[in-house]
């Protein structure tokens, strides 16, 4: 299933040459670590991993003994998306070409074993593509994104941020455990 056009992939590769591009996961790593450890997860799939800053920061924070599966079309050496207990998709959705958004959501649905941690900006990016477009190709409000996710995911938690929101999702087949 195609998730990116060849032309846009080339634009993304050139953006990834900038050392300051793809750093959003660094500040979110403490939240990812807390979620990971509190749920006794064993694996993380980093969808849109870029330079693997999430993995590097989790290791610096002391998270050990976890399987890490990076995926990013700009880094074909990472391979295909892999299923994991926790699938992180940080600062990715807003960069997806609109015509491939449903394919990306389907990809994520297929690899989430337990939970998905999505961080999405709802404002324009500070960076522009070589062709002059804003790096955020999809700039929509939180409710637009949530309505898109509701047919595929169970929304467990939503947190608004300064530039967008973070959402914790489960596949729609998820059943909430009884409260003790």
Where are these regions (language model features)?
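A short acidic, helix-capping loop that chelates divalent metal ions and anchors anionic groups
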Residues: 125-131
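Conserved beta-strand signature within the Rossmann-like core of class I S-adenosyl-L-methionine
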Residues: 112-122
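Surface-exposed, flexible loop/turn segments at secondary-structure boundaries
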Residues: 76, 124-125
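Hydrophobic adenine-recognition pocket in adenosine-nucleotide-binding enzymes
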Residues: 92-95
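A conserved beta-strand element that flanks and buttresses the S-adenosyl-L-methionine
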Residues: 88
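Conserved N-terminal segment of class I S-adenosyl-L-methionine
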Residues: 1-84, 99-105, 111, 132-144, ...
